[in-house]
Regions:
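Nuclease catalytic cores that cleave nucleic-acid phosphodiester bonds
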Residues: 39-129
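Domain-level signal for Mg2+-assisted phosphodiester chemistry and nucleotide/NA-binding surfaces
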Residues: 1-68
Length: 129
């Protein structure tokens, strides 16, 4: 299953060991994490606007995006969240996020949502189709 990641999820992913991925994969199949190009742009902006510790985390997230995940081009939108939602709907993929507002909007669109709880990957919402 393809899973498109937002900035919040990616930042936590690089800073915290995450468990339960194998259980999610047993349910959905192999997870292919996708990073939208707009998230990379957002990370690059963050890298220059934060302190040294957070800047190193952002740099690690950018490097990991290119080495371990697939970076995908998404339709440009005024807001990164809109681009992620549009991509998820068009390509029928799940979304990994920590962002409450984005999760709410994804639920309204009946999309599969993966999030973190106590350093474990969980299914926050499942498509009803």
């Amino acid at each position: 299953m393809d899973v498109i990641c937002d900035t919040s999820f990616l930042m936590v992913f690089v800073s915290t060991p995450i468990g339960q991925i194998d259980k999610i994969e047993a349910y959905f199949g192999k997870l292919n994490f996708l990073i939208p190009d707009v998230v990379i742009s957002e990370l690059k902006d963050l890298e220059h606007k934060t302190g040294p510790k957070r800047s190193r985390m952002v740099k690690t997230a950018i490097e990991m995006s290119f080495s371990k995940f697939k970076v995908v081009n998404v339709l440009k939108s005024r807001h990164v969240d809109e681009a992620i939602i549009d991509y998820a709907i068009t390509h029928k993929c799940a979304v990994a996020t920590i962002d409450r507002d984005l999760r709410r909007r994804l639920m309204l669109n009946n999309l599969v949502i993966l999030t973190l709880s106590k350093n474990k990957l969980i299914i926050a919402s499942q498509s009803k189709t």
